[in-house]
Amino acid sequence: MAKVREVYQSFTDSTTKTLIQDEAYRNIRPIMEKHKLANPYAQTVEAANDLEGFGIATNPYSIELHTHAAAKTIENKLLEVLGSILPQEPVTFMFLKPRKLNYMRRNPRIKDIFHNVAIEPRDVARYPKETIIDKLTEITTETAYISDTLHFLDPSYIVETFQNCPKLQTLYATLVLPVEAAFKMESTHPNIYSLKYFGDGFQYIPGNHGGGAYHHEFAHLQWLKVGKIKWRDPKDSFLGHLNYTTEQVEMHTVTVQLQESFAANHLYCIRRGDLLTPEVRTFGQPDRYVIPPQIFLPKVHNCKKPILKKTMMQLFLYVRTVKVAKNCDIFAKVRQLIKSSDLDKYSAVELVYLVSYMEFLADLQATTCFSDTLSGGLLTKTLAPVRAWIQEKKMQLFGLEDYAKLVKAVDFHPVDFSFKVETWDFRFHPLQAWKAFRPREVSDVEEMESLFSDGDLLDCFTRMPAYAVNAEEDLATIRKTPEMDVGQEVKEPAGDRNQYSNPAETFLNKLHRKHSREVKHQAVKKAKRLAEIQESMRAEGEAEPNETSGGMGAIPSNAELPGTSDARQELTLPTTKPVPARWEDASFTDSSVEEEQVRLLGEEAVKTATQQVIEGLPWKHWIPQLNAVGFKALLIQRDRSGTMIMPITEMVSGLEKEDFPEGTPKELARELLVMNRSPATIPLDLLRARDYGSDVKNKRIGAITKTQATSWGEYLTGKIESLTERKVATCVIHGAGGSGKSHAIQKALREIGKGSDITVVLPTNELRLDWSKKVPNTEPYMFKTYEKALIGGTGSIVIFDDYSKLPPGYIEALVCFYSKIKLIILTGDSRQSVYHETAEDASIRHLGPATEYFSKYCRYYLNATHRNKKDLANMLGVYSERTGVTEISMSAEFLEGIPTLVPSDEKRKLYMGTGRNDTFTYAGCQGLTKPKVQIVLDHNTQVCSANVMYTALSRATDRIHFVNTSANSSAFWEKLDSTPYLKTFLSVVREQALREYEPAEAEPIQEPEPQTHMCVENEESVLEEYKEELLEKFDREIHSESHGHSNCVQTEDTTIQLFSHQQAKDETLLWATIDARLKTSNQEANFREFLSKKDIGDVLFLNYQKAMGLPKERIPFSQEVWEACAHEVQSKYLSKSKCNLINGTVRQSPDFDENKIMVFLKSQWVTKVEKLGLPKIKPGQTIAAFYQQTVMLFGTMARYMRWFRQAFQPKEVFINCETTPEDMSVWALNNWNFSRPSLANDYTAFDQSQDGAMLQFEVLKAKHHCIPEEIIQAYIDIKTNAQIFLGTLSIMRLTGEGPTFDANTECNIAYTHTKFDIPAGTAQVYAGDDSALDCVPEVKHSFHRLEDKLLLKSKPVITQQKKGSWPEFCGWLITPKGVMKDPIKLHVSLKLAEAKGELKKCQDSYEIDLSYAYDHKDSLHDLFDEKQCQAHTLTCRTLIKSGRGTVSLPRLRNFL
């Protein structure tokens, strides 16, 4: 399985993984459905693991609760097993609820018999009344079953049952008997049940739920051994039990065999007859236990508790390996090996016995006292057996030697859950012989007292349904409320009617008068506007008297069309009181005669003016069609070049107007006729249909269709290829985005409602949801995505919305596949983007878009929009009547809460990975309408087609915001000015502190940890395993032809040889390091890489921005903070010693090239545990020396951004910069979640892998902080043109460049959040290339597309956050007690210092590091495993013996 898992883990392609997951899910579903019957419950993780060991799966998403779910699951599983072996004929069930037959999957038509005896009061509620009998009667079936009862009975019950029921042949029975109770052990399955012992009995407690507990006598455990039961059947009752002959007795035998066993639940098969059964009966034993031999007197002082054999062997080897095994050391070792959570399972007396026993073993000699057979001559060898016999007899008389004592003392007795079966013969004993094994005699009723303890008394009562109660409450409420007749009119009070005023009538009169005034005012405005239009048209007509308007057959030139003059001319009306125009929604008019005359005169004037305008328009014949889709079309509009925009274009003549097919809803036909969209019967291109069908059959395209069976794909292609032609009535509707193509169809569908044979096919699920929302009163299955429609079928009328986004050939294939389709309606835009197939081997990739084929059947193109305002629509060449100004803005910042449009699907997935779920591609946003959108511009934008750009630009109704995420490179080739010496670029103004130190509040005094004692360990126990594999010096050293071997393995001390000593003067190591760590390039290639990684840089920055809580808008530049950071950097530099400043003179000189870098090899001892004693020395690390002013400038920049980062970063993010271990401990205790696995992250070649993508990220980050542009350009220049003696370096991180730590940390954060989908509130700690998270987040799906474009590769390490497995961060372990140094790493480093003789110099530092763990004392047993405890103990002893005799952090603080 490990090899298979390794192969599966090697798959990195996300598509392959998706296919594997889909296939696995299809296999999982029937399996989970099968196990759901027995295990429908929500289980704990530990219980689920135990159940899986029994072959019982658990659904991790189940939420059904039970007090003892695991135990109940096993009970159900045994019933399921029983159901599979029971015959399909009537069976007698005893002590069983009838509803449990469901778990057996038993046919309810079988007339099974139920015999239930009410032993306890609650049995009345447990069993249905019709199944309860006064006493057990004769069993009339061949097979019977006793449920969870047999363990309370003795074999005499079996004898009586088979004796009184001659027809009975097979009896099945389930028992609940924990095998470990025979040894008085704790439960071997504590997650399923627990045990408690009381005198001569014990309690079985399922799931620690006392309500379901059983009480057993130890005598019940005899059932575990029963193999056969025999008895006699006297023919004459006069003979009694003693006086009989063979002829007078008939022999009977039943055979008992274990059928199945899960934990404490067992299924027995008891068969009439003397049959074969295994001599040994074995029960499941998860762990191996032993009991020490009973060697002490009195017997009570021996250790009788079964102990894990592993623990016993660890203790034995410990006491035999240490020099002196003191009593306290053995106790400490026992404390170390036993988990704190398991201590309550041991009594103090048992531990004393165990330690005493181990101390006894430690004092005995392990050297044999017997002679060997190899020494001596012939005579000696001949007499050797005699001597051995004499020595053996001597020890029997005078006592054993130490060696013989040790051999007998370590002869552990295994605890074996295997028993030899026994035969119970009642032929010569009374039937009550079983009770001889019981500690006392118990009546039959007492035996059955705890038989059924998990019943629910409420099961037998009928409860009133909730809806019935609510109905009664509603009825009571209605009765309390006086009824009101809806149709009853309000009567006026008696008396003078003139004095009565109806409030509703008064209100309506006021509303009527107000509305009339508003309508009249609107009519005046419209009349004036029509007069202006008429005047402008007349003016243009006079300018061109010889020209006439062109017909609708061709688009007229600019000279032929009327202009848009600004001339104003008042329209003279008969009265100053205009009336509502006919297109206004005026519900009320004044009833006076004067106002009626005004209304008639106003209508006449408006009609006349409107008709004059229409007569001058080139599209006057298309006005009804334009009005039908909501356009008045009375204005002339022009694009940017001055060309008039026609609202109707691409007219196709010659198409016959055919009748709609029979069965077409009249509402739909009416709307299409009004828009002049009559159907035309067209032939479909079968070649396109066959190409699509071939791709589907061969699973080259699609998502859902790939999951279909091969036979379905063959049926699809077969049906398409069988057709010679296919014609269908088609309505093609083309129009601009927002022109209302779908509006009329949706209106008709709302009128039609449910019950129609119409299917709407949509290209995306988002569009499907939009249609469902706009047409809510239809069946949900009317709207389908295109693959669902192909698989699930359609109606006889199919509407394809945005059909240009459907795969080429899909429409033809669907219509050919479903012959019942008689009418298709296509809505789309030939000017917008079309479907693009990415599969290179797909046949449809070479087909043209569907709009090319169907455009010749579209009667006209509606070039008008309701979506965009007039200014934007006209720039796009589209007619619009929306007034106002479209807001256009551009910056490098993203706006929040509005959709984001990006040029590529890859970019979309990456942005969605940052939490921007409303991200669409330019092409994929088709159908989207939003008030505001933001469009991301990058290097892919320029390669997008005009159709795609039109789609993106036409999405917004009010505002478009362009986001330019690339860096400005205009000043890239400019050089930095030469800088003066150190004294000239240092500022001498007064330094300002960034923030004042505020002393922390006094913490409450915590209760001190209890003292503990760690057991003594061998000095070499930690490093010995590394020394065993140590090679010779020159086998490990690096060798080069020019400089010979390196010199990293030094001295003859094997401890020192484990550690590689890297020195700056080692030429071989220097060149090996340069070859491994540095890569050369050239300035032009570096800059090309920088530009090519723009798309990745902005994704990294967006993830970083979200992770660190930076504001969405740019952070204004603060000169005050910049100067404070500069002074801080300067002060730190001047704090160096004078010698260091003098040594840096060369880098301070103006003659030092600002792009030049001096590279050195870092001198260090390599103390990483994973690099101890490596077979081959690894290359070292480089240090880069930059021009000093460059270091200080970019150091200031890094500190400036750090200042703002610390101000905004969330509390759950901790950056280990200028902090103390105490700070990290407090943070971890308040934020870290220790209840789940964690992830620690490291990288391979972190510095060298920070390429152009990381530089893009840094530039965007600097821009967000409003760093001056000249500083950003200087940083780009130094990163792309860094020169060493070998040439120009590739873009990478160099130690010593100024912002190394901050830049590494921020790149680490950006990469981690780009790769992982980290839940909100997750505790995270970062420092350079080290990081740790308190959860194991999932890898984002979008990261797989980005992974190959990043050089950076992470090395995640998952820890379980339990004893011995804690997340590591910068050499610190994050534990529930705070942070502490990794004891193994600390000990390894200490051993190096001790071997070099430098321990005295650094002892205080080691004591401080050790004290963070040492001060937790006894709690360390819960944190460290055995190996860590060994390292901790050895470190403590080394420091205590060589120092002041103790280790304590408070004491060290006082001392230092």
UniProtKB/Swiss-Prot annotation:
ATP binds at G735, A736, G737, G738, S739, G740, K741, S742. The keyword Nucleotidyltransferase applies. Keywords: ATP-binding, Helicase, Hydrolase, Multifunctional enzyme, Nucleotide-binding, Nucleotidyltransferase, RNA-directed RNA polymerase, Transferase, Viral RNA replication. Residues 536-564 are annotated as: Disordered. Residues 1236-1343 form the RdRp catalytic domain. GO terms for biological process: DNA-templated transcription; mRNA modification; positive stranded viral RNA replication; RNA processing. Residues 695-862 form the (+)RNA virus helicase ATP-binding domain. Residues 863-997 form the (+)RNA virus helicase C-terminal domain. Belongs to the potexvirus/carlavirus RNA replication protein family. This is RNA replication protein.
